């Protein structure tokens, strides 16, 4: 279980950003933007799934996740930890272990045979569920799992993402209006700060990334992507 040693939030954010660069989980490509599932064009891309392949790094990140939840939500606020199919599942298992809690996972859709279950594992009626994802942009994907948990009788008031895009100022407020507080460890601003500190890219690339973070939809539209996001 977790040792309850709390590292300062800013230090955790910087360390996670450095870890992501170290394992080459983040990429900047301003001259040939990535196309995200939302249809946005983006000069940045992240693959948090790579974390599971680096034991020392994943252990530190999960310690930070536990510290974030205990500090911001409390010690006795949850009965179950839930991960979404598929990226959230290993992180849910590791966080549940640290918090000393049961774990469930949520399918993207009912499996269509047998019990036709969408939630796997034991979730008692009224259980207070903490949902974890590897990353979230505006919370939309997380809410697919939250809605399924609520429909099955669980209570969800908190979610945590190891990495939060933090490019839409209204996103956390939108989640709050739907009854969920979003917690996170690191953001693109932290990653960009480390890239500048270590001079990982030329100024032109770094400035383009910053322009995207300042006005993501305008940057997307200018570079061949959508200029507005579909409603959840």
Swiss-Prot record:
Subunit structure: Homodimer.
Tree of life domain: Bacteria
PANTHER family in UniProt: OROTATE PHOSPHORIBOSYLTRANSFERASE, URIDINE 5'-MONOPHOSPHATE SYNTHASE
E.C. number: 2.4.2.10
InterPro entries in UniProt: OPRT, Or_phspho_trans_dom, PRibTrfase_dom, PRTase-like
Catalytic activity: orotidine 5'-phosphate + diphosphate = orotate + 5-phospho-alpha-D-ribose 1-diphosphate
Class of enzymatic activity (EC top level): transferase
Protein purpose: Catalyzes the transfer of a ribosyl phosphate group from 5-phosphoribose 1-diphosphate to orotate, leading to the formation of orotidine monophosphate (OMP).
Annotated GO biological process: 'de novo' UMP biosynthetic process; pyrimidine nucleobase biosynthetic process
Protein's recorded name: Orotate phosphoribosyltransferase
Residue sites binding orotate per the record: 137
Protein keywords: Glycosyltransferase, Magnesium, Pyrimidine biosynthesis, Transferase
Cofactor(s) in the UniProt record: Mg(2+)
Pathway(s) it belongs to: Pyrimidine metabolism; UMP biosynthesis via de novo pathway; UMP from orotate: step 1/2
NCBIfam families, alphabetized: PRK00455.1-3, pyrE
HAMAP family: PyrE
Top-level taxonomy: Bacteria, Pseudomonadati, Pseudomonadota, Alphaproteobacteria, Hyphomicrobiales
GO MF term set: magnesium ion binding; orotate phosphoribosyltransferase activity
Membership in a protein family: Belongs to the purine/pyrimidine phosphoribosyltransferase family. PyrE subfamily.
